[in-house]
From Swiss-Prot:
Keywords: ATP-binding, Ligase, Metal-binding, Nucleotide-binding, Zinc. This is L-cysteine:1D-myo-inositol 2-amino-2-deoxy-alpha-D-glucopyranoside ligase. A motif ('ERGGDP' region) lies at residues 185-190. A motif ('KMSKS' region) lies at residues 286-290. Belongs to the class-I aminoacyl-tRNA synthetase family. MshC subfamily.
């Protein structure tokens, strides 16, 4: 699948060894080094292409954009893979409700997402794979699990046998009752007759009338389950194990728990660290496609909002924070952008040295991607700007993705 253009990332001067980039691991509930090796590998779970791109999406992908920028500045080779779930129940339901062919809906929304990511200067994945593209690899993987006794059939469907994975449950660390409730709430079918365990997830859904299906070989015609898609796409894009799997906080369970389990059963390894972004609210409730309380990036931009203002508004909050969007966020971000732009044109000899901004922003991002602390460092300099303003311009560009 075609990605979007890569924004320029200017090189920054460095003296001394870079600090390790620490992130909050959702499994251990502690700060860990995101990628200790020379190559840093990241899989961020992508969109289901309807109602794209809302600010919840943008907030999540901004977190992993910052992570990549911190890695690149530390001299690492970054390999980033993501997906588009371009066939799934919610997409099919929306297409049916609106009378649009599901393929056209997916195509149009994916293109809108590309446009929004370009405007927000997000670094694109090296490989960006649609669920439909991944079907041959998913068929191979599910067939292998079935042959190994790690999966079983229920009528025309194939389910993972979670008892084959002793590590299941370690990613989220939830009790059985909580897992069952969340599984039912987030697309699972714990009450399906014939399953060995209520939490066993679908790997392959048999053909249904009026729904798209593909040749599954010995699996029969059908389409892939959600979790196996990401396991296979991450495996094929990064290899297993890899450094970081990321997404919104609502993906911790069941999606990341299940996809990690599938990866272990397929190749004996999975993500080493799981990182999750906080969820945004609007009008008093979490932004939700089902509720319809979404704020769309494209509509903000169409109304004349500078995309750097949108990016700054999101950066004003730590990526793990749960917060509510209001129009005040944009006004505050626009004032900040105006202040920074004015400051780079008005440096003076007794102002704060520009090098202090570079050091402070680096330190902030190395400490769990602390964007608010990074913005505060630039604010301090902008209040009394000194030194080479070009250093500040390059710093906020390379590390924060803000083009002044």
């Amino acid at each position: 699948m075609r990605t979007w253009p890569t924004p320029d990332v200017p090189p920054l001067p460095r003296t001394g060894a870079p600090a390790p980039v620490l992130v909050h691991d959702s499994t251990t509930q502690s700060l860990v080094e995101a990628a200790p090796g020379a190559t840093a590998t990241l899989y961020a779970c992508g969109i289901t292409p309807y109602d794209a791109t809302h600010l919840g999406h943008a907030n999540t992908y901004l977190a992993f954009d910052l992570l990549q920028r911190a890695w690149l500045d530390a001299g690492k080779t970054v390999v980033y893979t993501s997906n588009v779930t371009d066939v799934d129940d919610p997409l099919l339901e929306r297409a049916t409700a609106t009378g649009v062919d599901w393929r056209e809906l997916a195509r149009e929304q994916t293109e809108l997402y590309r446009t929004d990511m370009t405007a927000l200067r997000m670094l694109p994945p090296a490989t960006w794979t649609g669920a439909v593209e991944s079907i041959p690899a998913v068929v191979e993987a599910v067939t292998a699990l079935l042959d190994a006794g790690a999966a079983y059939r229920v009528d025309a469907d194939v389910y993972a046998d979670l008892s084959a994975d002793p590590g299941f449950g370690r990613v989220a660390g939830l009790d059985d009752a909580t897992m069952r409730a969340l599984f039912a709430e987030r697309g699972g079918d714990p009450d399906r007759p014939g399953k060995k365990h209520p939490l066993d997830p679908a790997l392959w859904r048999g053909e249904q009338p009026g729904e798209p299906s593909w040749d599954g070989g010995k699996l029969g015609p059908g389409r892939p389950g959600w979790h196996i898609e990401c396991a296979v796409i991450a495996r094929d894009g990064l290899g297993l194990p890899f450094d970081v799997q990321g997404g919104g906080a609502d993906l911790l369970f069941p999606h990341h728990e299940m996809s990690t389990s599938h990866a272990r059963l397929l190749a004996g390894g999975a993500a080493r660290v799981h990182v999750h972004a906080g969820l945004l609210a609007y009008d008093g409730h979490k932004m939700s496609k089902s509720r319809g309380n979404l704020v769309f990036v494209s509509r903000l931009l169409a109304a004349g909002t500078d995309p750097m203002t949108v990016r700054l508004a999101l950066l004003a909050h730590h990526y793990r924070e749960e917060w509510e969007w209001t129009d005040v966020e944009l006004r505050t971000a626009q004032r900040r952008l105006d202040t920074w732009t004015s400051a780079i044109l008005s440096t003076h000899d007794d102002g704060e040295p520009a090098d202090t901004v570079l050091d402070a922003v680096r330190a902030a991002l190395a400490a769990d991607l602390d964007a608010p602390a990074a913005l505060a460092a630039v604010d301090r300099w902008a209040a009394n700007p000194g030194g080479d303003a070009g250093v500040v311009v390059a710093t906020v560009d390379a590390l924060l993705g803000i083009e002044l």
